[in-house]
Amino acid sequence: MTFIGGFIAACSALAACALRSDPASAPSTSATFVGTTEDIPNPDRGFYGWSGTDFVDSFEPGSVQVAFASGQRLVLARVSLAAYRHASLPASFLSMLDARFAAVRSAGMKVTLLFAYDFSGSGADASPSRIRHHLEQLKPVLAANADVIPFMRAGFIGAWGEWHSSRSGNSCGHNSGGTSCSTANIHRAIVRDALLANVPATTQIAFRYPSDLQLWYPTAKRPSHVGAHNDCFLAGPTDSGTYVSASARAYMQEFSQHTAFGGETCDDAETPVRSSCPDILSEGPQYHLAWLNSTYARSVLDTWRKAGCYATVASRMGYRIQLDRVAHDAAAVRGTHVAVAVDLRNVGWSRMFVSRALVVTLRDRATGATMTASAGDLSRLPSQANGSTRITVNLHVPLSAAPGSYDVLLSAPDAFFKTRGDARFAVRFANAEQPDQGQTWNPTGATLSAGTVLRIH
C-alpha cells in the first residue's frame, strides 16, 4: 500500500515523534473540533445500492449514478458465471469486467463484488477445480481494480453464491444431493485457498457461514482480509441458519471486531421477528456492521424509517472518523520540521478496512503554495471509541519555503494510485464546520481547515 507524501508513523497519545523547530520553549497553538451526527457519505462503508441484474451483461450506469446521488458509495456488482460452469472465461468477458470497474470508478463509486454460477436458487455451480481456474483467470483484473473492490463475497458456491445447496459437492445438508460434510469441507477449503491466493490482499473476502470460519480459524485469528457476510441479518434466532449455536454468535461478535462484517436483511424469515429498531441499534454495533443492502429487504428498511432509526443506522454503519483536537508550534524556521499532533477517533460501528494515512497540508495564505506530509494508518483506529488516538505528522519545512502565514489543512485521501487524487474517494471527517473558527470543508480538495495558522520564518 502506498501512502501520500512524507513518512508513515503513528504516535500514541503520550508519545512525541517530531523534531521541533525550537524544542526548548516554542509557543504552540491548538484548536478543538465539534462532532456531528449528520449522515456523511464516505467510501468503503454504508448502505450499498444497485448496478444492474448482472454487472457484466446488464450494467446500469443510471442506477449507479442514482446511488451516488443518494449518498451511497458502494454498489452490489453481481456477476453470473452460469455460461462457464464447464469452460474457461473468454478474454471478452474479462475485458468487459475491467470496463465495468472503470465505469464504477468514473462514477465515484466502489463495489461489493459477487460471483456466482447460479442466481435462480437451483445451486447449479462448478467443481472446485473449475472455480480455482476461474479465480486464476480473474486475478489480473481484480488486481488492476483493487482500488474499487473493498469487499468481495466468497460467492461461487451454491445457490446465489451463498455456500449452500451446491450441486457440485461443495456443500452438505439441505438441497446438497447427499454430499457428505467431510467431502464438502475439503471442497470448500480448496475454494477458500483459491480466493486467498487470487483476490487482492486489500479486498475483504466475506464468507457466508460462521461455522466455516470457526472450523478454519478456531481462535478468531485469521488472514487480514477474511471477513463475513450475513445474508439474513436480523432474521430471527438463527438468522435463517446462519448461527447454529450461541457460541457461533459470540465467535462472530469477536471476529468482526477485527474484520469486515456486512450483509442484508430478510423478510420475516423466522419467528419471533427480530428486526426492529432496538434490534438493529443493538446488533449493529455488536457485530460491527460495515455494509448493508439498501434494496432488500424493503419491509425491514421501511420499518426502520417509520420508527425513526434508519438515519442512525446509515450514519453509524462502518467507520466514522471524528477529529477532536489539533496542536502544533505557532512558528517554524525554514530547514526544520514542525510536528502537527491530531487527536481523533473512530465512532462508527466498525473499523476502516483499507489502510489510509492522515495528511497534513500547509497552505501559504499569500500565494496558495502548499507543502504536505502524511502519517499513521486510520484503519488501526478501534471502532466505537470513547477516547482519542493521537497521530503526529512530521512535516519538513524546506529552505525554499516562502516566509509567511500558512493555514493547516487535514485530509485522508484514498491510498490507491488511481483514486488518491479524486476527492470523491477521500474520507470526510465527522465534524461540523465552524466558519467563525476558520474550520471549513473544501469539497474540491477534500480538506478540512483546522482553524490554526503556522508562521514560517
Task: Please describe what each predicted stretch is.
Residues 2-15:
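Bacterial N-terminal signal peptides
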Residues 12-32:
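Bacterial Sec-dependent N-terminal signal peptides
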Residues 28-73, 78-80:
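Boundary/entry segment of secreted carbohydrate-active catalytic domains
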Residues 61-118, 128-131, 203:
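Aromatic-lined substrate-binding rim segments of carbohydrate-active enzymes
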Residues 93-106, 126-153, 184-198:
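An active-site-proximal structural segment forming one wall of the substrate-binding cleft
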Residues 151-158, 162, 166-297:
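Catalytic-core regions of glycoside hydrolase
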Residues 276-328:
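Catalytic cores of secreted or luminal carbohydrate-active enzymes
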Residues 314-457:
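Extracellular/luminal regions of secreted and cell-surface proteins that mediate adhesion/ECM remodeling
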